[in-house]
Amino acid sequence: SCYYDLRFVCFNNINWIGNGLTLPSGPLRENINNLKNYNHIFLNGNLENLDAITRKLEKINPNLTIHIGEYIPSNINEFSKNDNFIVFSGIGNHQTFVRMIKNYQLNVVREFEYPDHYNYSTNEIDKICNEAKNLNCKIITTEKDYLRISKNNINLDQIKYIKSNLKIKDEEKLINSIIKL
């Protein structure tokens, strides 16, 4: 058994604990009651559901230090609020990505959600591009998906990506908790 000075766990604040079950039946890697063994928790996403999640966490482990992270797009100014968009991604939290885009008042007309680490075929990308043409939309994906597609020699002329960074709220609290060691 290993001893850790600090134990962190991370959740997306939209998906949170999903159906509450562990793998393979649910998204959790261990039972939610094991949060009693952790010092710190990261809730990342778009600042939704934080109060309800925080109350539940405090019931399980009142000693948890909760850190909040928000995804911030760094190139959002490259996209016009006057345009319509089709969004696609193959990431673990597609809805977090879509909500981030919508929070910046971009009009998402259609979205395509694929499994995490998805390997897109040329036909699938062509389908998205044709749909965008038919709906007079521009196409947005994640930087991660864009890079994955670019390795497959797929034409990327119509596809743009959002660069996003995780901004830790109250970063000083996190740094101080690490320095205390």
Residue ranges and their predicted role:
Residues 8-11, 35-45, 58-71, 77-82, ...:
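Conserved beta-strand/loop subsegment of P-loop NTPase cores
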Residues 115-118, 156-181:
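Short, flexible loop segments at boundaries between secondary-structure elements
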